[in-house]
Amino acid sequence: MRRPVLLVVAHGSRDPRHAATVHELVRRVRSLRPGLRVETGFLDFNIPSVQGVLESLDAEGVRDVVALPLLLTRAFHAKADIPAVLAQAPPRLRIRQAEVLGPSPLLLAALERRLYEAGLTPADKSSTGVVLASAGSSDPEAIAVIAAIAREWRHTGWCAVRPAFASASLPRTEQAVRELRALGCARVAVAPYVLAPGFLPDRIARGAAGADVLADVLGPAPEVARVLLERYDGARVPTLAAVGA
């Protein structure tokens, strides 16, 4: 049986670094699973659009697609935007929407990879406070998930972990940095819980001016690519609801 095509659904951005990072991540996914067809579509700003990719797949005779939101939390885009776009797909396509990437232990591993690349070592954990800096959301579920991830991560040995948000929610990154200083952590690191560079990650970076360490975005980290494949495999389970025919 032919495997469903994996369609990675990215938000898109006017910042060219965003699309470049998405494409680099997709190339890593392809390298991890040769033979799996992986396509990329954007909701806005970049091409190809999700709708355009779906129409092209339909014209080729593809019938089975897993649409994977390139999102870390289940907020508005995953709940409303993406289902609305998929509902407009050609009726002959059978489309299953996969779960968003987070939360996942692999993403915590990717965050730590970025912190170590920025200069920390495992020996620094107990004396380092970390700001888990996300893009932000007005969705209560997404906010609660970020807070839960911070609590879970704290139990892996860090001095403390505080969530922060670049938009829509509080606290901001700079406030979380100050809180960790007040707790007495010997050093403070900021770990952006975002997938690609852009406007909000740049805001996180500015808010990290008072920190000792600023990690890079998650980007094409190997652990992120593995999460994509996990979500793809999970969506292939027949009991998941399909969008379309």
Task: Label the model's feature ranges.
Residues 1-245:
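Active-site-proximal alpha-helix that buttresses catalytic centers in soluble enzyme cores
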